[in-house]
Design a protein with these regions (language model features):
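Local sequence-structure signature of Cys/Sec-based thiol-disulfide redox active-site neighborhoods
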Residues: 1-30
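Short beta->alpha linker loops
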Residues: 9, 34-35, 76
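Short alpha-helical
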Residues: 12, 38, 79
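Generic alpha-helical hydrophobic packing signal
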Residues: 26, 59-61, 71
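Thioredoxin-like thiol-disulfide oxidoreductase module
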Residues: 33-56, 86-92
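Long, continuous compositionally biased terminal/linker segments
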Residues: 47-67, 80
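Non-catalytic, surface beta->alpha helical segment in thiol-disulfide oxidoreductase systems
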Residues: 63-92
Length: 92
């Protein structure tokens, strides 16, 4: 399993989610969306094409497992860090 966390430096929820992932011993790669704007906008555009109501905010996680990947986005898929962690565990 591979977890990628799309984040922003000053995002309090992003910081809290990083801490929670560490507490759970889940390794992850961080991508700062302001450094990788083109990549982030491409992902957001792709998700909007799949679901026009799919607005994605940070933090967003990409969980890849057994050849499939799913995006878990704040405001769309979870409202709290605890909910985000529950969603991640569904794909373990």
């Amino acid at each position: 399993m591979k977890i990628t966390l799309f984040t922003q430096w000053e995002c309090k929820t992003c910081i809290a989610l990083k801490e929670k992932l560490k507490e759970e011993n889940l390794t992850y790669k961080t991508i700062e969306v302001l450094e990788y704007t083109e990549m982030w906008e491409g992902i957001r555009k792709q998700q909007l094409q799949l679901d026009p109501k799919s607005i994605m905010y940070t933090p967003t996680l990409l969980v890849e497992n057994k050849g499939t990947g799913v995006y878990i986005a704040a405001g769309r898929d979870f409202d709290t860090v605890e909910e985000a962690l529950e969603k991640v565990k569904e794909y373990l």
